[in-house]
Amino acid sequence: MKANIHPNYHRITVVMTDGSQYTTRSTWGKEGDTLNLDIDPRTHPAWTGGTQTLVDHGGRISKFKNRFGNLGM
């Protein structure tokens, strides 16, 4: 096996949208970093069956609507 090809695997804290948090191991960030979620399994419409509005990060939803909004579906 090749040495030093795998990313660093360390502990981080994940904060859910309701403020609850848990510690897990990840390759994201650095040891001890905190990952704040914008949407999680408790609030995502795909898992809750709700009709909450999606957060438009980087204008992706707006860009899609501008491009395909005139299809009239």
From Swiss-Prot:
It comes from the Bacteria. GO terms for cellular component: ribonucleoprotein complex; ribosome. Part of the 50S ribosomal subunit. This is Large ribosomal subunit protein bL31. Keywords: Ribonucleoprotein, Ribosomal protein, RNA-binding, rRNA-binding. InterPro entries: Ribosomal_bL28/bL31-like_sf (IPR034704), Ribosomal_bL31 (IPR002150), Ribosomal_bL31_A (IPR027491), Ribosomal_bL31_sf (IPR042105). Binds the 23S rRNA. GO terms for molecular function: rRNA binding; structural constituent of ribosome. One of its GO terms (biological process) is translation. The gene is rpmE. Belongs to the bacterial ribosomal protein bL31 family. Type A subfamily.
